[in-house]
């Protein structure tokens, strides 16, 4: 009995309820388990095959590996699959053919011709038969897998439409679409039984072979409403559920707890819980006008083997992995049950062994120069200087092609047939004749992890420990619990499986704005940082036990990384331009990097390499690395970056991945920055954060709020997961292998009661001798003597089994879901959907109803759906924040409550802090502290209180409120508090302005801005703008000066014009008339007067001798006169006698004889004049303009001197 119990417990445990700590997985085939109490199968993941138009496609349940298997399958396709054969069978109604193809799309072939009016088909995978129904003829026909031995199984039926088979129970089911009935019969064609009848229409039938239930789609006669119904194999326990798709259902298939179905109008595949219709996921395929057709889920558990296998042990030799016959090289004949050897092997004489055939020894290999035998095969070889041609048989001498000829990925050889591409050893040429594939080629032989060479032309794929090779024999999937995503959604934290299932909210209350998030696999806790509340928290994976770790010195934390081995966490603060570190409990926090860092955002830690990696989105964007202490900094990338945001590490390959939000690119490189390349660009929206696991890179998109993934090597196979998201930020993959090296047994013994052992990152519990493991896989039950003597029976009446947990939890889950908004994830294989032309706001969700789509603003936003604005809940008075002890902070799409100064709590429940008892006051030694609500008061000791009195040796802190003999304190710091440490950037000094109740920064030279955030280019741009204003002023001033000069020139021109006009009237002397006027006013003047000179002219007054008797001196040599006096040696113009009309000047005679001129002897100076008159006594008399000058008068009375005035 004890043995039976031990065997049954794992079987029962597979029905346990799925939670975050025990994610859901498919049941295990043939009882093979892997892992601990939350075990899952070691086997392939399920995938879907479906008909669409005249083609057959396949796609994973996660939306990946979407490919076309059959191109021309026919217009109307009815299909099923045979898992053991790895084949798809379908009926082409147009050509009346039964055809088949392998699951990978290869070797399409015809099976047999088939009659018209086939309405349904199913595969009997145990008896190796194909069964189909003919609605017009009212018959069901059966044939073998090769199309032979066809015969009618059932006849005289009422319009048999859909067919389903359970060969394990040996039942065949079909529906009558016209009559609305369901029937059952044995596979032998006997025992026909009507299960139920309905007045409505039945369109599709499918079986749940594990739970032994029949499912069908039921329509009302108007076709306006569709339901999914089920019953047991006897027609009892009928269950009806309405799936909220608002579309008519067409085809369906079941697997595990999920139901997959398609609709008529929508080009989508829906996934939902088969019991409740909830946990819905929609796979949105490429836009098409043709609806989806048949739909099947492919997995070995969908076609289980019969349990009553009665073969003898000697007839099962081919099933053994060890022994007489290896399962890797032999199969089993269905008739004789004896071993059959694979190609390249021959059966041994005792017919129990498969022996290798040496093809090289029989000379039937076809190699031209060399042959080498391998187990089950062989390959051709070539000597040095020769290369193996693409046919794998012939060798050719190596003659390289010209460079302009070769387009080969490896190298090219010239042959008589022309240039041919060839590949290195370990690779082969692809079908395009240019690309190489293999372990020695860049594609790694198509293997997602390990490529193992078997020969120079063959290889096989393998996986790292903890990963399983999938059905395609190339990709690897992590074993153990099903991985899922955690992501910060700005105002909450959500979780979701890779296929969109289990989509829900983990934390939503008092979140504010959360961009930073990470997971600790050892204690199974999440760490996250608030940018609105400005602190860092942690909580359990179920959202309980929230703890504040860092509350002081945090401003804008946008990146966070947990060192799960070193037991620390690191964060980036973009507001304070630093990187901090702390123990996981929040103790011993310190700043490790602050110098030469501008705006750090994303951060990742590599515990094995002991390195930190982060992105900097500042003026000089770059990717940097340092030791865990902040030393040994290294720039990974600095070119071609604009706004590098998220960063992550692939620990399997030691590759670094990051995203650039402004360039919309995903890039990768080695840990040292080498071999950098772009993985994808232009189709990733606005990526914010990035994560990597298995074969895919995940990243969050703000442009179309969603989570996306692409292949981590090629950048292809893009899939989008969306569903009522706001701003998905940090991404974390939760799985034991996502962070290798973690030891869950270090924390609380891994949850095990007795013994804990680490197995691939998970805790494996076992019990000591005398105990047995309970159903939870962690606790141990004592086996006392009474139990052993009684046969080891254990009373499980009071034990809570997983089935009890399932039922109770589902009831509570249903109650919660009814009161909350149900999140529905959508897998977008293509961005072309019905919502694309609507243009919804990024803060709205699209609701598709048939061919119409509308936009609805998300919670916390208001608008018409195309334009949604944030609702200020604080202004509207919606929040529940207690006004006396907390304040409301509005955030994007929500709000948070934060306790006021003097209080502590979660923002909604705030308690007063006793500053006096804690010593957090500044009353001084001569004052006593009294705690008050939200603050404290200081009272002077030993003296009477007076208004305005301050205690001696005590300085009142800021924000004091004087009230007679005491003052009340709200904030005892005179400078900026610790919460604003680092508020001012680039060495700026923080100041608190009490009058304005605001903080300000005193910036150093070269930095400006509210927080001294502008420098270098930004600062110079502002300065350049100021210089530009100055230059504008200078330009205006110059223009004014030019205008003034032009005005002066115009005046001068006018004056010049007037002078020329006077000259034209009196060309000899224009000033003669004025001279006459002067002479008429001077009667003492001589009658003849003086000969006037035109203006300008010279008035020359020099020292001279009085030449009596009219005698003229004779000039001597070297400018001396006849009397020895000096004569001028240079003149502007030769002196001329007066009266000759010269325009440059004239000589003025001053002798007793008329017309004679004085003798010039010495210095001269220029001065304007308008005429002269002769004075008596031999001295010139100046013009009235000159005589008015006292200096001139003095000089005029001095006989020995004369003056020369020149213009």
UniProtKB/Swiss-Prot annotation:
Effect the entry attributes to changing residue 1070 to L: In HOMG4; affects basolateral sorting of pro-EGF preventing the hormone to stimulate EGFR; lack of TRPM6 activation
Residue ranges of domain EGF-like in the record: 314-355, 356-396, 397-437, 435-477, 741-781, 831-869, 870-911, 912-952, 972-1013
Identification of the protein by name: Pro-epidermal growth factor
GO molecular function, a single term: epidermal growth factor receptor binding
Region O-glycosylated at one site: start-end pairs: 801-807
Family matches, as InterPro entries: 6-blade_b-propeller_TolB-like, Cueball_EGF_LRP_Nidogen, EGF-like_Ca-bd_dom, EGF-like_dom, EGF-type_Asp/Asn_hydroxyl_site, EGF_Ca-bd_CS, Growth_fac_rcpt_cys_sf, LDLR_classB_rpt
Any one of the GO CC terms: extracellular space
Region of interest: Disordered: 1067-1093, 1108-1131, 1177-1207
Main location: membrane
Compositionally biased residues, Basic and acidic residues: 1070-1085
